[in-house]
Regions:
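A structural micro-motif
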Residues: 27, 56-58, 80, 129, ...
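Helix-adjacent hinge/juxtasegments
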Residues: 56-111
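Residue-level signal for inorganic ion chemistry
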Residues: 17, 49, 83, 136, ...
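Conserved P-loop
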Residues: 2-75
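Generic beta-sheet signal
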Residues: 3-5, 29, 78-89, 131-133
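Short, glycine/serine-rich, charged loops/turns that create anion-binding
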Residues: 10, 36, 88, 138-139, ...
Length: 182
């Protein structure tokens, strides 16, 4: 089962995702962190999220790309909720850090790149009780450089590709919640 939480940065997505994860009824709750810390601002953001989770019963895995690898590190994955924070970081990491995929996004309209990530996410979702995915949706701006515009487009493509697979989609930008019945 997949729950997708979409919003703008600092919109409360993380707090909502944690609430869903902790109240989901599964005995184990994994926080799957995708952020690569590269500077002091990243350290502060990571520390803020760690503090939010402190004492709540999460165990943490840090996997910046190829998130389907998390399954092998989870004891009894079928009884586990996984909170993936966040898809935005994952897309950037796949674009720049994954040695096998970092050029894939440049080859076509992005379909092969987004399909590869979607495949990883669906494999993870098929192996765990509940996968909660936190993601951003950014507004495009003509002043952004080409690579940034590509990143925004790829993230949006992946968000749209996930929606049909999600049991519920919560869009904090519009305040809507859709339950699809998947």
């Amino acid at each position: 089962m997949i729950s997708l939480i979409i919003g703008e940065p600092d919109s409360g997505k993380s707090a909502l995702a944690e609430e869903l994860a902790l109240n989901g009824g599964y005995p184990r709750v994994c926080y799957l962190a995708t952020m690569l810390v590269m500077d002091e601002a990243g350290e502060r953001r990571r520390d803020k999220h760690r503090k939010m989770r402190e004492g709540k019963g999460f165990f943490t895995l840090e996997i910046p790309y190829r998130v389907d690898r998390a399954v092998s590190q989870i004891e009894d994955p079928g009884a586990c909720t996984v909170l993936l924070e966040c898809l935005s970081n994952l897309v950037g990491n796949e674009m720049h850090e994954d040695p096998e995929r970092k050029d894939l996004w440049k080859r076509d309209d992005g379909s092969a790149f987004t399909e590869a990530i979607l495949s990883d996410l669906l494999a993870l979702a098929d192996s765990v009780a509940h996968l909660i995915i936190v993601t951003n949706e950014y507004r495009t701006d003509a002043s952004y450089d080409g690579e940034t515009q590509s990143y925004i487009r790829l993230l949006s493509m992946l968000n749209r590709a996930l929606i049909p697979h999600a049991r519920e989609v919560r869009d904090l930008r519009t305040g809507t919640e859709v339950r699809t019945g998947c």
